[in-house]
Amino acid sequence: MSASLDLWNIPLRALNINVRKRLGLFLNPRNTVASDWMSVAENMGFSYLEIKNYEDCQDPTRKIYRTGKPLSRAQVGKLVSILDNVTRKDVVEDLRVLIEEDCKRYIERQNEPPVQVPEVDSCVPRTPERQGITLEDDPEGGIPELFDAFICYCQSDFDFVHEMIQQLEQTDHKLKLCVFDRDALPGSCVWTITSELIEKRCKRMVVVISDEYLDSDACDFQTKFALSLCPGARSKRLIPVKYKSMKKPFPSILRFLTVCDYPRPCTQSWFWVRLAKALSLP
């Protein structure tokens, strides 16, 4: 690692989804020669019974990363140290560039001047309201659950959302979608949770466009909030998906964005591949 980076002063939350996914690709497969996720779990202080219970998880590395209290409040340096201890320097070397980039971005964000002075900052509440808002969040405020994309949809289009889950999560794409009705816990302010998920937890947002979408206040808020985070679509953050033929005009605020047109026969065969690729970009 770069000598100019003090990894022991950079929290694990600085590492983005791509690094965490690659950790799983290296450590999830059971290996008789090299150490796998079980060795990492032992070094993190997990008991034998806990490790045995995680064996059935689809992504055990992600599971221990999220639930391991010794690691959840640790630094990037701690993770690198554990990988060294279990003789997985190959993982450290493969991820070195990505880890350094994430750490540098984190330091840059920390050094950026705030948009508002703290006395008038109304964007981030000083309460635990934004902690423990999804199914896999650490209730004690550890590493938050992160997603590849937030899905903006109205209730009448939920069948298409189910298909999206099947095509993008339950296939080789292995993307992680944030579906509000499935992933968000009840009991908190809808607007607070929604803004937190879109801005802090999800890399992108998929907007399911239909006539019913145009009548949804929730979809209107989510779309405008996401657009405000990426003026000019520089980060390709918002991806409109036209779900079915529309009688009403296409929303004007989205006309400057490239659309995934699901009902168009000539492109339907590669619809899911295009969408998955767009959501997989760094």
Swiss-Prot record:
Give the subcellular location.
Answer: Cytoplasm
Mention any Pfam family matching this sequence: Death
Q: Where is this region: Intermediate domain?
A: 100-141
Q: Where in this chain does the record put each TIR domain?
A: 145-279
One GO location term (cellular component): inclusion body
Region (Disordered): which ranges? 117-138
Keywords, sorted A to Z: Cytoplasm, Immunity, Inflammatory response, Innate immunity
The record lists its disulfide bonds as: none
Q: What is its main location?
A: cytoplasm
| Record's keyword annotation contains Cytoplasm | yes
Q: What sequence ranges are listed for the domain Death?
A: 22-99
The molecular function terms in GO held by this entry are: TIR domain binding; Toll-like receptor binding
Q: Which GO terms describe its biological process?
A: defense response to Gram-positive bacterium; inflammatory response; innate immune response; MyD88-dependent toll-like receptor signaling pathway; positive regulation of canonical NF-kappaB signal transduction; Toll signaling pathway; toll-like receptor 4 signaling pathway
Source taxon at top rank: Eukaryota
* Keyword flag Cytoplasm: yes
- Sum up the protein's function in the record's words: Adapter protein involved in the Toll-like receptor and IL-1 receptor signaling pathway in the innate immune response.
Please give the record's comment on domains: The intermediate domain (ID) is required for the phosphorylation and activation of IRAK.
PANTHER family assigned to the protein according to its UniProt record, in alphabetical order: MYD88, MYELOID DIFFERENTIATION PRIMARY RESPONSE PROTEIN MYD88
**Protein name per Swiss-Prot or TrEMBL:** Myeloid differentiation primary response protein MyD88
Q: What is the lineage of its organism?
A: Eukaryota, Metazoa, Chordata, Craniata, Vertebrata
